Amino acid sequence: MSEYEELLDKFDKSDMAGWTRRFFDDLESAFQRDFGMIEENDWHGVLCVGMGGSGAGGTYLSTISSKAAGLPVHYWRDYGLPSWWGPEWLVIATSYSGNTEETISSVEMALGEGGSVVGISSGGRLEDLLKESENSVHIGVPGGQMPRSAFGHLFGTQLSLFWCMGLLPAPSNQELEEMIARLRSSAEEWDPLVGTKAVDAARHI
């Protein structure tokens, strides 16, 4: 057993290193999902709501969309909704547990004002709320992980949703395969159990 493996065995009781290595599997799995059941609409924009790691994808989507999308995409990390929001804005609510208090508050407000919500979670109150709404959809992701380790599932699902709804230009299957391959190769170079870059960098700190 290497020194690095000994450290992991001693301190990484939740197997974050293992979950991190499986990030690309989670991402690839999410990219292969089909969201054809979600109808297109004449949205004025998209508001991504979520907290912490569950909300991080909204930040990335906002940045990506500012360069490539035809609609404005904003994110919200708080209770309720911004004062300018109206039901002509689609709400995409992400909460890994499905029970995040702030996110549930945003969803309840959106539904109460006649809005449409796409929710992404592993279950919880978010799923229950959206099952009761005719204008909303819940998309499930695998549970059983720590929220911070589930970013591949969450962001991959968000991005796939944007592609399927035509909110962002969708890459070809070949482009997706090449992207995943590049990410895996780069990650392996920095994985102390596989490559040497991380160890070499640590020695210079």
State what each model feature region is.
Residues M1-F31:
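Cofactor-/ligand-binding subdomain signature composed of acidic, glycine-rich
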Residues D12, M16-W19, F23, L154, ...:
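Alpha-helical structural motif
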Residues G36-M37, N41-E188:
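Glycine-rich phosphate-binding loops that contact phosphosugars or nucleotide phosphates
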Residues M1-S2, K13-A17, T100, I104, ...:
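Short, structured coil/loop segments at alpha-helix boundaries
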